[in-house]
Every structure is written in structure tokens, then in C-alpha cells.
Amino acid sequence: EYARAFRTVYNAIKSMNANARVYISLDQQWNRNRSSKEAYDARDLLDEFNSILRAEGNIDWGVAYHPYSVPLTWPKFWSLQTDFYRSLVLDSPDTSMVTMTNIHVVTDYLQRSQFLTSSGQVRSVILSELGYTSSYGEDVQAAAIAYAYLIAANNQHIDAMVLSRQTDAVSEIAEGLALGI
């Protein structure tokens, strides 16, 4: 149903602005083998979504990815705290989670022939939501943002990076997330 609803929205947007880009939004849970109404794996959803859209006529959709750190409360995504967290973030298409450390997993996956656009191009990828807590200091938060930007800028298939918040959200501070810059 989602793919069909997406196509309807896509067609409505394109009818008003032929140059608009329309994205499917996915979070950092790439391949955790979840199957419930409350959670899904981004890779499984992407596979099914693409399969349905191709079968019914390929359109030019893109991916809006949210590569938050694991756990969300740890800003140093390049240096995960425990073996457990490190086991979730691998340089493999079978990784459980995708953060900025391994964001290339998504862009590499989209280079597969079945995901290419009708013109043979890799689909647009934007990092439409990410952020790092300042709970460990603003210098650590700034380093995380700068490093994330460096990774994004050096991946030719990432078209944009958007930070989650300009100011801290009161509801998130209690959870250890001070994502405002």
C-alpha cells in the first residue's frame, strides 16, 4: 500500500513541479530482522518498495536517510562505546544499523542495477535528519557534525545533509538528547 500511496503523492507533486524530487524516508535500522507493525527494516522496505514501483512503471524517487548514531545518546559515531554497538554498525550490506560511519552501505546498495533510475543513474540520497547530542560537550557535538559533513561531502551520491534541530527539544533532553546546535 505504501508504494502505491507514494506513487500517488509523487504524481501529484510532479504535476505541480516537474523538477521536484520526492523521497522515501528511512531510519538507521537497516537490517535488524524486524517484522511487526511497529517496526521495519529499512533495507527490506526499500527492496519491496523498489520492486513494486519498478513492476508498475519506474519513477524517479530518492532516499531520505536518517543515519543517527548508535545509541542516539552517543555523539562519537566514529568510536562506538561497546562491542555490542560495534556489532550493529558494520561495513556490510547486512549491517544492522547505518550511521555516518557506514552510510556508504546505503549509497552502495542503491548502485545495484535494480535500483537505478530509468536513465541508469543512482538515485538521489539526502540525509534529511541527523544530529548529535551536546551532552558530552559542544566541542564533541561540533566535531561530530563536522565529521558527518566531511563524510557526506566525499560521497558523490549524497546530495544534502540536514541537521535535526537548531534548538534542544525539552522532551528529548530528559532522554539524554540535546540535539540543538
Q: Language-model segments: what does each one mean?
A:
Residues 2-139:
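Noncatalytic carbohydrate-binding groove/subsite architecture in carbohydrate-active enzymes
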Residues 137-181:
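Aromatic-rich peripheral "rim/lid" segments of glycoside hydrolase catalytic domains that contact
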